[in-house]
């Protein structure tokens, strides 16, 4: 019985323009400049935890304001959830269903599982953090009850159009804003450096920093900003129904400028579109973004998406500090500068910048309100001894900024009419009584009222008269969706009596609906709370089982080692002949082999992967590790389906017991827990009986970034080095780029502790070094002794995953 909007969503004929609303001010900027919908976050579970975000009370009034204007609001719950946070998540879902939000945007399978089972009033959108990049992934979402997929930004227009033909699901795609170097949801860079996880909404953006490769400084991992304003007809033709603007961390001024520009182009008639695009591009130049790129939309190998010589900072570059005083800076400004503009100074060390608003401005020895481009200016700073000569100065907003205080925003929101609840009404007049039956959701009310009626000489009581009377809810926020009136006699009822009946009936109905909605909220909440798994009693430790991940089939004889229970080997779709040859060697060890499916599987290679899976199943292999939602369909129609042993890899995110249970619901028998996790959460998860086996990766090379972006001129034989002397290896293979630390991840040395928590299945990933290399042998020896290998990191295990 939620109060969701009935306004039309995006379609291929008229797309939805979807704007960020990281603050109340940005919400109004979006509304006033033509957004059809906005997405916003709450204080918890938002992938932009550093944004202002909104409260539940704010959201309630925002929904009133938006729905009154036929607009929609989607709420982001697109982070990974810790075990201890599940009770808060359940309460959040109950409140969002009660409020009637138009959809929630989801990453963690726990949110899907709980919403599907206990909060049916919530529409689900799959976040781009789920890395949906092929038709099989979209079709899987459709089967799971999602209504929309936010596609990976790595897809081309051609790939989107081909995908569109294979699904009826709503498709959403980013058209403007910051790009991640990595596939969204698959970056561990920030978390690796300090526990601030991008998948928990706290990315510290180390990709935007400057690095060194063979003494050449550059911004190797910093993409330019997406701008697809001249590709909107192509996106619509490809089947994208929602055009999304990135920027919940951006100012209201940015939102106003970008939404206004895209609205102008979307609404332009075909004959005027060229002029509209030209004007919109000019307006976008003032939005203080990075250099524009079309991203992958025009092809899989864009040359302008990441240029190492271009700074990764946002804002319009004004110049470098030529002189730094104790509390002022001097520089030659490239663009006009005004009192009221906001500046950010970026240190040459490439650490975080410092922002401040220009309060006074000096040109020469005179104070000025503004200075034209090309002028040497002196700007007093509120910070003492903070800046140095050579630091870069950026303008990040102008004096003309869209400004509205939070208090002013809330006053405007409270002026919106409460959202009416739709009702259907049946009316009958019989034996001097007006019989009414109303229904709204699960609530039904029937009442009879004595009325005075007179024979009608003209204009007898009819459906239109009744609609006119009962369409007005008065003080009760109800909306007449439909009215049925059967066999009305030719009489007249005094209008005053009809209005009094409406007032009495609607007053009772409104109270009944309110009580029913609250009872439904409590019932759904209690059901979901009861479904959360309790802690289980501690069980006796089982014998540890070791699985070793290999990089190729040449190390298959590792299975001769009695301490190795299983091996994981890569399934490479285009090398089916090699797979078949390797499979022949393994006929007697089939149950000890797990075939690892490639995480990224574009539609051009998906069928090859399916053929390889079927060939392996026919050869008697049953164990496969899945790493993306698009992998589940690979096993549809496979013979011996019931004999399959499917493992969920860590890229499917199992950070809590509900996510692990979700994979069980989909036929998975074992889940590999999330390597970003910390000690406390791992222990809490392992204390729950999810009904699936759990494995923990205890050693490996973590791919901090997986990307479709090719870095020209950078090879794997030399590291890319940070200003802190941290070294990273860049590898390119199969059209993908991976960036890994030279330092391995390892929990070896903590095995006894993990076993005490209840873990008994461990994965040692030696794909990057080889099982029989000196380093591989050292790691296996360290595992046998539970001794920490040299030069490794425990990632977040001993510190908190934030």
Predicted feature locations:
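Extended, positively charged loop/linker patches that create polyanion-binding surfaces
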Residues: 138
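Active-site pocket-lining/capping segments in soluble small-molecule metabolic enzymes
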Residues: 2-132, 150-154, 158-242, 249-392, ...
């Amino acid at each position: 019985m939620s109060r969701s909007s009935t306004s039309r969503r995006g379609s291929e004929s008229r797309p939805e323009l979807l704007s960020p609303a990281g603050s109340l001010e940005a919400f109004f900027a979006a509304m006033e400049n033509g957004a059809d919908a906005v997405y916003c976050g709450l204080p918890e579970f938002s992938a932009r935890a550093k944004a202002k975000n909104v409260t539940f009370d704010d959201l309630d009034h925002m929904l009133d304001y938006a729905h009154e204007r036929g607009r929609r609001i989607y709420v982001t719950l697109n982070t990974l959830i810790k075990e201890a946070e599940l009770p808060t998540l359940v309460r959040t879902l109950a409140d969002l269903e009660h409020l009637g939000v138009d959809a929630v945007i989801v990453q963690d399978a726990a949110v899907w599982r709980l919403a599907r089972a206990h909060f049916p009033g919530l529409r689900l959108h799959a976040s781009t953090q789920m890395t949906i990049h092929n038709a099989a992934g979209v079709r899987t979402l459709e089967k799971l009850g999602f209504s929309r997929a936010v596609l990976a930004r790595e897809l081309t227009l051609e790939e989107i159009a081909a995908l569109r033909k294979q699904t009826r699901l709503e498709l959403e795609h980013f058209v403007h804003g910051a790009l991640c170097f990595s596939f969204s949801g698959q970056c561990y860079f920030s978390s690796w450096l300090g526990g601030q996880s991008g998948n928990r909404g706290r990315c510290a953006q180390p990709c935007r920093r400057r690095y060194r490769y063979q003494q050449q400084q550059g911004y190797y991992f910093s993409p330019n900003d997406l701008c697809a304003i001249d590709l909107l007809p192509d996106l619509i033709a490809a089947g994208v129904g929602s055009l999304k603007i990135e920027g919940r961390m951006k100012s209201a001024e940015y939102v106003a400028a970008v939404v206004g520009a895209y609205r102008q182009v979307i609404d332009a008639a075909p004959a005027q579109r060229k002029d509209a695009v030209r004007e919109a591009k000019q307006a976008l130049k003032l939005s203080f973004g990075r250099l524009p790129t079309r991203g992958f939309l025009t092809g899989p190998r864009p040359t302008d998406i990441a240029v190492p010589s271009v700074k990764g900072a946002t804002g319009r570059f004004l110049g470098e500090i030529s002189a730094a005083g104790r509390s002022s800076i001097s520089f030659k400004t490239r663009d006009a500068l005004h009192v009221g503009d906001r500046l950010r100074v970026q240190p040459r060390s490439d650490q975080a910048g410092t922002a401040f608003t220009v309060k006074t401005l000096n040109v020469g020895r005179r104070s000025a309100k503004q200075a034209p481009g090309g002028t040497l200016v002196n700007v007093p700073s509120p910070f003492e001894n903070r800046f140095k000569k050579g630091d870069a100065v950026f303008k990040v907003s102008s004096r003309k900024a869209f400004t509205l205080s939070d208090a002013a925003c809330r006053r405007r929101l409270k002026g919106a009419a409460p959202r009416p609840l739709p009702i259907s009404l049946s009316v009958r007049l019989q034996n001097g009584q007006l019989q009414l039956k109303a229904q709204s959701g699960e609530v039904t009310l029937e009442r009879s009222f004595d009325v005075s009626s007179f024979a009608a000489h003209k204009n007898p009581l009819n459906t239109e008269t009744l609609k006119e009377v009962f369409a007005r809810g008065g003080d009760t926020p109800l909306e007449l969706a439909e009215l049925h009136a059967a066999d009305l006699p030719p009489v007249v009822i005094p209008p005053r009596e009809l209005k009094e009946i409406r007032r009495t009936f609607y007053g009772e109905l409104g109270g009944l609906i309110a009580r029913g909605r609250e009872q439904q909220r409590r019932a759904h909440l209690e059901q979901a709370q009861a479904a959360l798994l309790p802690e289980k009693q501690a069980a006796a430790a089982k014998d540890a089982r070791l699985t070793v991940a290999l990089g190729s089939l040449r190390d298959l004889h590792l299975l001769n080692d009695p301490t190795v229970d299983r091996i994981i080997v890569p399934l490479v779709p285009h090398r089916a002949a090699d797979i078949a040859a390797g499979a022949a060697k393994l006929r007697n060890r089939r149950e000890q082999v797990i075939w690892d499916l490639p995480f990224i599987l574009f539609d051009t290679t998906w069928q090859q992967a399916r053929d390889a899976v079927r060939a392996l199943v026919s050869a008697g292999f049953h164990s496969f590790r899945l790493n993306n939602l698009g992998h589940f369909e690979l096993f549809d129609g496979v013979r011996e389906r019931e004999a399959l042993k499917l493992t969920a890899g860590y890229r499917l995110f199992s950070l809590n017991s509900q996510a692990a249970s979700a994979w069980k619901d989909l036929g998975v028998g074992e889940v590999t827990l999330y390597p970003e996790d910390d000690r406390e959460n791992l222990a809490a998860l392992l204390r729950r009986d999810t009904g699936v086996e759990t494995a923990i990766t205890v050693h490996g090379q973590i791919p901090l970034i997986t990307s479709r972006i090719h870095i020209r001129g950078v090879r794997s034989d030399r590291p890319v080095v940070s200003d802190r002397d941290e070294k990273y290896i860049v590898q390119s293979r199969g059209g993908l780029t991976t960036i890994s630390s030279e330092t391995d991840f390892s929990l070896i040395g903590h095995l006894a502790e993990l076993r005490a928590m209840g873990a008994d299945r461990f994965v040692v990933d030696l794909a990057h070094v080889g099982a029989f290399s000196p380093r591989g042998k050292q790691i296996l020896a360290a595992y046998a002794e539970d001794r920490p290998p040299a030069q490794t990191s425990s990632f977040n295990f001993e510190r908190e995953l934030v």
